[in-house]
């Protein structure tokens, strides 16, 4: 069962990336290191509802 999720950088409040995940394989919240246009560097984006 795949669901769409939004990734947010907590410090800047930036919600830049949309992705999918399989809830059965990854029940925990997803954390990915992605590029932030606002900060111009790679930072950790976390899953939000």
From Swiss-Prot:
Keyword annotations from UniProtKB, A to Z: Ribonucleoprotein, Ribosomal protein
Q: Which Gene3D superfamilies match?
A: Ribosomal protein L33 (2.20.28.120)
- The family this protein is said to belong to: Belongs to the bacterial ribosomal protein bL33 family.
The protein here is known as Large ribosomal subunit protein bL33C
Q: Which organism is it from?
A: Lactococcus lactis subsp. lactis (strain IL1403)
Gene Ontology terms: biological process: translation
Gene Ontology CC annotation, any one: ribonucleoprotein complex
Q: Which GO MF terms does the UniProt record name?
A: structural constituent of ribosome
Q: Which gene encodes it?
A: rpmG3
Q: Which Pfam families match?
A: Ribosomal_L33 (PF00471)
Top-level taxon in the UniProt lineage: Bacteria
Coiled coil, from the record: none
Cross-referenced PANTHER family: 50S RIBOSOMAL PROTEIN L33, CHLOROPLASTIC, LARGE RIBOSOMAL SUBUNIT PROTEIN BL33C
């Amino acid at each position: 069962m795949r669901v769409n999720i939004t990734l947010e950088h907590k410090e800047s409040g930036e919600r830049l990336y949309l992705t999918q995940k399989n809830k059965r394989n990854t029940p925990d919240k997803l954390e990915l290191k992605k590029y932030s246009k606002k900060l111009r560097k790679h930072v950790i984006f976390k899953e939000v509802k």
